[in-house]
Amino acid sequence: MKKILIANRGEIAIRIARTCNDLGIKTVGIYSEDDSSSLHLSKMDESFIVDEKGANAYLNIKKIISIAKLSKVDAIHPGYGFLSENPSFASAAKRAKIKFIGPSERSLKIFGEKTQAKGLAEKLSIPVIEGSKGKVTLRQATAFMKDLKKNSSLVIKAVAGGGGRGMRVVNSAGDLKEAMDRASSEAEAAFNSPELYVEEYLKNYRHVEVQVLGDGKGQATHFHE
């Protein structure tokens, strides 16, 4: 790669640009109408405005791909947030014959739908938390909670969600309906899908993430916690 477009702003865009500079890779930045003086632009070799204000500028797939073509980049790095987990963005880059630095469209679709991702983990014999196999109704969630051990709690999650949105911990079956109603409304507002699934809630555990890097040719490694 000789030139990449960084489809993001702020700290992550600066970090990517610094790494590219160390590797001798030219960078192209983008910015919204109200981000014209943002620090990340000073770290880029070239910068282009996306004619929108605020976060919407960094979510405009059509305009970002157009800039990528115009600037003749080899690849696009989405950073995190914004379009980084959007399968349509990965697909658009592929159609434009520009490498997407991130998971494939297929992988993004699978992991964007949490019950599919969990099903894949089970298929690969990876231990998972006890929970529903897919979206649930109030009746199914109530039955699941009754089958849990005494004094156990349940966590409601958005099928299409992430970042804690559409999530509720329920300690009593009597609170389940209200919690599901609220979680469903929140999930629909955030992810355009009201669907929920449930899992046993594990108390006194930590959320741990592991970064994985693949070369697109079957080789992969991880960076621990």
PLM segments and residue spans:
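N-terminal beta-alpha lobe that positions the nucleotide/phosphoryl donor
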Residues: 1-225
